[in-house]
Amino acid sequence: MIDSIKQKLEKLNPLNDSNKTKAAVFIGILYFDDYIESPEILFTVRSSKVSTHSGEVSFPGGKWEQADKNLCETALRESEEEINLKSSNVNNLGALNYLISRHDIEVNPFVGLITKKQDFVANDEIEKILTVPLNFLLNPSNLINQEIE
C-alpha cells in the first residue's frame, strides 16, 4: 500500500505557484511492523484557545517562514512544534497539489511515512492527537458527502 501511495505521488503534476501566502501541512502515515499492523493517518484537533481553525480536525502544519529552506521543511518544523514529531523518524514520500484555504492561503500537503515509534506531545495549539486506520478512510461505506452552506 505504501509503494502505491508513493507511485501515485510521483505521477502528480504540480500546480503553478499561486502567489499567495504559503503554508504547509504534514500528512503522517504511521506504519512500522513492531507496533502498527496496518497504516494509520495522524491527525490533530486544534485547541479552542487558538484564533483560527479552533476545534477543527487537521494535519499538523503552519505558515512558511523565511528560515525554512522549502515548504516540506515548513511542514516538518511545524509538526515538531505542534506534536513533537521528530523529522529523523520521517521518510518523505512526496507532495500533493496545494489547495487554497478559506483564509486565501496556499496550503501545501506533504506526505511522509513515520518509521519509528515515538511519543507525540501536543503543544498549546493542539487539543488532541489522534490516528485513524487508512483502511477505514479508504472504505467507501465510511464516507459521507455533505454540502455545507
Where are these regions (language model features)?
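N-terminal leader/linker segments that precede catalytic domains of diphosphate-processing enzymes
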Residues: M1-S58, K63-Q118, A122, I126-E127, ...
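Proline-centered turn/helix-capping motifs that create local helix->coil transitions or kinks
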Residues: L138-N142
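Acidic, negatively charged sequence signal
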Residues: L143-E149
